[in-house]
């Protein structure tokens, strides 16, 4: 099967790839890394002092045209059963199927086979497929 290319492949610009970490999470073990907005009256991060960690704001948002776009130029479409890849039949140059995490390995095989018949690419075709010798 020839490699499908996306209709348009815009340049994806990530304004920031590092995670935003919580203030003083590097200092204390009990404070997790997950971002929380600082709300203290004297907090240096909230007041945006020079040299402090950065806070997320609207300026870091992705471009609307390239948001949720894979590096290959396609977008993901979550598939839960064998009938859902047929939705992508007319737009297989802009979308790729991704099998949901809660689909059984038996149904995964069927979805991958059906997608191959319809010339639809799957982003995770080999996930949770067991070899024949293990069965």
From Swiss-Prot:
It comes from the Eukaryota. GO terms for molecular function: structural constituent of ribosome. Pfam families: Ribosomal_L32e. GO terms for biological process: translation. Keywords: Ribonucleoprotein, Ribosomal protein. The keyword Iron-sulfur does not apply. InterPro entries: Ribosomal_eL32, Ribosomal_eL32_CS, Ribosomal_eL32_sf. One of its GO terms (cellular component) is ribosome. Belongs to the eukaryotic ribosomal protein eL32 family. This is Putative large ribosomal subunit protein eL32'.
């Amino acid at each position: 099967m020839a490699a499908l290319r996306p209709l348009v492949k815009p340049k994806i610009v990530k304004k920031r790839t590092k995670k935003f970490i919580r203030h003083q999470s590097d200092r204390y073990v009990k404070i997790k890394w997950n971002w929380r907005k600082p709300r203290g009256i004297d907090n240096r991060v909230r007041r945006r002092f020079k040299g402090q960690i950065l806070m997320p704001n609207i300026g870091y948002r992705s471009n609307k045209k390239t948001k949720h776009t894979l590096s290959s130029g396609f977008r993901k479409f979550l598939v839960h059963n064998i009938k859902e890849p047929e939705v992508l039949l007319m737009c297989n140059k802009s979308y790729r199927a991704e099998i949901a995490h809660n689909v059984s390995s038996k149904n995964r095989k069927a979805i991958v086979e059906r997608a191959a018949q319809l010339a639809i690419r799957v982003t995770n075709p080999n996930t949770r497929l067991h070899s024949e010798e293990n069965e």
